[in-house]
Regions:
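Pseudouridine synthases involved in rRNA/tRNA modification
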Residues: 1-3, 7, 11, 18-23, ...
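S4-like RNA-binding module at protein N-termini
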Residues: 1-27, 35-40, 64-65, 71-72
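Residue-level signal for inorganic ion chemistry
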Residues: 16-17, 59, 85, 124, ...
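Glycine- and acidic-residue-rich catalytic/RNA-contacting loop of pseudouridine synthases
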Residues: 21-33, 69, 86-134, 150, ...
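A short alpha->loop->secondary-structure connector
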Residues: 31-32, 74-81
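Glycine/acidic-rich beta-strand-loop module
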Residues: 42-76
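Short histidine-centered loop motifs in beta-beta connectors
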Residues: 136-138
């Protein structure tokens, strides 16, 4: 497997995480960190994670000091993360904020609760791509396990291909599209379109993604009063 390097900086690098690769080695399969270290000939530090079924932009630090700084940015919610997801179900709402505590359920799954002691927070809006297919643009404000997958399921729109929470397909249609942050007073924005998946390669999706890339797509006005 050859990993794609998206961005290189003296202190960190961004790669494209393919689907089906875990962050850690398991069952004789090398994890993404070791694969990246072998390919690029560097010692790397993990500063955030993506689920095995998720593709997209992933950051690694190149030394311990950068790892501490970037990890702090993630923990302080100072890194803006934008994900793309597809669903064949009509959501309860087309846009909004999904907020609630998460609890472990059966067989490694999670569920969203009505309580808000330590809530997962996800902002989203959605657009119709074609009949029976909807694109969700999501910005998680927290970093809980399975957060976006559980959030969209709670809206009645489980992610296409998510066999844990929805219906099977050729992949789980969740992609880490873009990250934006400031590091040592310099602004960075790194993005990558999804490569894998029949539905992510349809012209209707590609055209919609181009519209998002070319405009100020995020509807800030309806989030001002969210809490």
């Amino acid at each position: 497997m050859t990993l794609q390097r998206l961005f290189d900086h003296p202190d960190f690098m961004a790669i494209y995480k393919p689907i089906g690769v875990g962050m850690h080695s398991e069952s004789g399969e090398l994890g993404l960190q070791l694969l990246a270290e072998q390919q690029f000939g560097l010692k790397l530090w993990m500063v955030h994670r993506l689920d095995k079924v998720t593709s997209g932009v992933l950051l690694f630090a190149k030394h311990a000091e950068a790892a501490a700084q970037l990890s702090n940015l993630f923990s302080e919610q100072s890194i803006q993360k934008t994900y793309l997801a597809l669903s064949q179900s009509k959501p309860k709402r087309k846009q909004g904020r999904i907020k609630g505590d998460m609890a472990a359920a059966r067989n490694g799954s999670y569920k969203l609760l009505k309580t808000q002691s330590n809530p997962a927070i996800t902002d989203f809006f959605s657009l119709s791509i074609e009949l029976g297919l909807r694109l969700f643009v999501c910005r998680p404000k927290t970093g809980k396990t399975h957060q976006i997958r559980v959030a969209l399921k709670s809206e009645g729109a489980a992610i296409l291909g998510d066999q844990r929470y929805g219906q099977p397909s050729d992949r789980t249609y969740l992609h880490a599209w873009r990250i934006a942050f400031q590091y040592q007073k310099e602004a960075f924005q790194i993005e990558a379109a999804p490569l894998e998946g029949e539905w992510f390669n349809k012209n209707t999706f590609i055209d919609k993604l181009k519209q998002l890339e070319n405009g100020n797509y995020w509807p800030e006005h309806w989030l001002k009063n969210q809490n």
